[in-house]
Every structure is written in C-alpha cells, then in structure tokens.
Swiss-Prot record:
It is found in: Cytoplasm, Perinuclear region; Endoplasmic reticulum membrane; Nucleus membrane. It comes from Meyerozyma guilliermondii (strain ATCC 6260 / CBS 566 / DSM 6381 / JCM 1539 / NBRC 10279 / NRRL Y-324) (Yeast). This is Nuclear protein localization protein 4. The gene is NPL4. Transmembrane segments: none annotated. Keywords: Cytoplasm, Endoplasmic reticulum, Membrane, mRNA transport, Nucleus, Protein transport, Translocation, Transport. GO terms for biological process: cytoplasm protein quality control by the ubiquitin-proteasome system; DNA replication termination; endosome to plasma membrane protein transport; mitochondria-associated ubiquitin-dependent protein catabolic process; mitotic spindle disassembly; mRNA transport; nonfunctional rRNA decay; positive regulation of protein localization to nucleus.
Amino acid sequence: MCYFCDFASLRVSYFIINFKFQLTQIIRFRTPSGMLRVNATPETAFNDLLNDLGNQMGESDLSSFTFSDKPNDKGSSANTFHGKSVADLGLKHGDMLYVTRTATSSSPAVTASVNEPKSGSAVVTKPINTAGIIPIHGPTKVKQLEVDDVLDTQDGMIKRKKSNLCRHGEKGMCEYCSPLPSWDKGYREENGIKHMSFHAYVNQINEQKNNRNNSTSYMSPLEEPDYNVNLNCPSGHAPYPKGICSKCQPPVITLQQQQFRMVDHVEFADSGILNDFIDVWRQTGVQRFGFMFGRYEVFDKVPLGIKAVVEAIYEPPQAGETDGITLLPWENQELVLKVAEKLNLYPVGIAFTDLTDSGARNGTVLCKRHKDTYFLSCLEVLMAARFQIEHPNITKHSNSGRFSSKFVTCVVSGGLEGEIEPRSFQVSTNAEALVRADIITGSTQPSMLYINSSQGKRYVPDVFYSKINEYGLEVKTNAKPAFPVDFLLVTLSDAFPLNPTPRFTNGFTIENRDFMGNLQDLRAAYRYINSDPGNGSCLSNFHFIVYLVTLGILGDSELQMVFD
C-alpha cells in the first residue's frame, strides 16, 4: 500500500474542495419580505439565482418584481437578465440587490371576507396572497369606522399662542410658539393627559418609519404583538414541542405601561342610562352586567382623540349575586346586534357593578378599588382582554387590517368619598397577545396575574416588567411567577355631558329583570305605549325596539319605519 499516494490524493481533494468553497459567493437581496441571502458561484445563471430567491420568498413567479443595485431605483425586470451569469452581471461576494414589487403586479391572489365582530365596520375585504402575505405599498384597503377616516385627514398639530419669550412680530413664528406634534410628551404632562391618542401614536410611528416624500417605501406603522410559538417554522425541524429554534420561538417579553390608548373618553349620553342600570343593585343588592351600545366620535379635549358615546345598556341573561355575576346563555344575541346595527350603533363596551353598602344609611358605598388594592382584578383583566379580542379595531395602518380594539370596560364602584362612580379602562395590546398565547391566568390575589408554565404546545418565554424606581431609573424585574395587573391597564376618562341630548328615552321595562318582578310582556308594552304623549317618542327606546323585533308582529317595512 502506498501511503504517500493516498496522502497526495487527500491533499488534492482538500485543495479542490477549498477552491470551490472560495468560489462560493453570497448575494444579498433586500425584498419586501426582508433581507434574504442566496449562495452562488460566478458561473451560476442569474435565473437559477432567482429560483432560489423565489423559494425563500414563497413566490413561484418573479416576473412582477424589478431588480436594482441602488435603493429607491426603478430597476429592471427579471426577464432582462435572461441567459446571463453572476459573473456577466459583475456581481461579487456580499453585493446587494434591491427587489421591488411593481405597481401593476398581478400575482395570484384570492379575496377573503373577514367579518369583524360588532366593533367596527361589518366586513373587511383584503387581498390575501396564496403564497403568503406580502407587505404592500401604502395603507391597507379596509373599511374603517367613520371617526377613523375623519381623524386620518387631520394632522393634529397643537397650536400655541405667542408667548413672552417670542421676539418676533404677529406674523412670525419661533420655537416658543410653533405648533407641536400631536404626540408631544411635554404637552401631555402639562395638561394631565396620561396616554396619547391612538391616531397621535400612529402619526408618531409613521414619522419614524416612513418618508412622506417616498411613497414606494411605505411600511405599515402598526403590528400587533404575537407571543405564540410558530408551529410551521421554515427551518425544517419538527414543530414544537419536538423542536424549537430562534426563528419560531417568541421573543423575550418586557411589559410596561402602554403609551397610547385606543379610546380616550367614555361619555354617557344621559345620566338616566347609568341610573337605570344601577337600580338593580339599589333594589336587590345584587350586582349587574350589561353591554354598552353607542357610537364613536371625535374627542376634542385630546389631540386626535376618540370618545365612545353610550346610548343604551343592554342587560343579557345573568344570575346576579352580592359579590359577583354569572352570565347565562344569550339566545337572542344576534338579534340584538342586528337591531343595534340597523340603528347605527356599535357594542362599544361592557359595564358591571361592584357595589357594597357602607352601612352608614346615607347612600354611601365602600371604596374597594384604589391605588393600594386594584382598579381591575386579575379575572376582570382577562375578561376585558377576551372581549377586546372578540371586537377588533379595523384600521388601514396595519398589514393585517386590524390592531387592538376600541372596546372598553366600565366598572361602577365606590369612590374615595363613598360616592357611586363609573371608571373606564382598556387593557393593552400586550394583554391581548398574552391571552391569545395562553401565557397568563388569574391568581388568588386580585392585583396579580399568574404566568403559566410551558406545557404541551404552549411555550412561555421569559417575561419581565419595567418600572421607574424611587431614583428615577428604569428597572427590569422578572415577572415570574406573578406580576401586578397595573402593567396591562390603560385608563380612560368618563363623564356625562353638560347639555345632554340622548337619542333614546327611558321608561320601558328593561330586559331580563324577571327576578325583580319586572316583566317584558304585552301588558308592559300596552302601558308604555299608552304613556306616549302623542308624538311617537315611545318608539325612541332601545329596549322597546328590541322587544318589538322579538315579538315578530311587525313586517320588514314597518320595522324599517321604526328604525328610521
């Protein structure tokens, strides 16, 4: 045996492999899907390079894309490079090409109708690419709420008057009197505004992400957090829990107070709406739950603000107790929602009572919710998150066409002075994502949320919460096994109008109060109709309209007259 020949053969093989390795190049592509890399040699045909790129992008046909070696350049179509190799095009290791989808792209797509449950417009129509969702140039085409369309046309700049620091004439402007952006932190602190409005937040992110002078590089400013593990990882390993990698596992979660809120203010159209709702507790001592129906309007007390105007509270079937509520099956839910839709009303939130008499016999109640206890309990936070998930906010500023929710939670409880007062809240987008991923659950301590452990297909990443300590420094704390619910809460203001102009009247028996002896029947309807002064105002009662539709004695044309 000739060991020298074997050694020489081994050296030749090594040099051949090493030479081929040195010829291998990496060509980078900046695509709408992100940065992608393709291996090639100088002799590789550019068409083969594009085939590998198409596989990574999930695109079988790249004829609708252009390629350029300069950003923001129109570039050339893929057909231009037919028959050319990497060397012919002068491409070297590490070179980058910019890939742009042409405006006249006709990639195969199907149109899916996504029904929005009750919170925004009825239907969202959005093209969905069968090969995967591709970011588009410009805002997503969806049907938003009217208030969102109105606020999208406003810049929200905060005007300031000429101050003592100004040294110019009446027609001049300087840094002390120039308009402020709608998200200005100093303005919020000066005026006691805890959270910026949703549209101010969108404008702030747009300012950071998008160049208003270059519409072709548009990036949607909003993206909902997703803490689910990806069970279809592109790396090729077995799905979790059999396999996991950095591409499919969710990132580390850091919770902090949300800077913005989807709704800034809750306005009850008339105090009688809330009084009728609280009367159940006043007469029986049991708690009550209801769905608030109303509309969304511009709120001018906050830059680009939104307020929810509550016109009625519908009480679904429930079993009330002195310390809680059990919701029962709601058989006519779809009918109630259809009636509300006919009346141009939305389910804007829920309301529930948590009242305990103080025993002083002066009408005061105990103050159980304050900064030293909790404002919403852990179970109520989970409930609010689930309702918000069921009522998504439709927006053109997100690739998915959805972002968080405008659904609010109002709890009627005791104030610091023993008075009965409503308090309105929402939970953050992080709370919604944590509930979707089944990461959090309730605990025996109302002010704390418990973090679940990884089990089955549920993967729980590291969770931290960030707060400012007594020295003004930001400190991160491990959230496991439990963390305060305050990090998921968003507070709203609420009030009654000074000059109320409610859409509906009061007086008809409210539904599902049989246990109080208040029945919705023909006798109650007869008494209510006879109490009408003769101007038909009795038809302006939400509970009565729902009862009429439930009876089924009116035809479609007659019901339409009632709705009108």
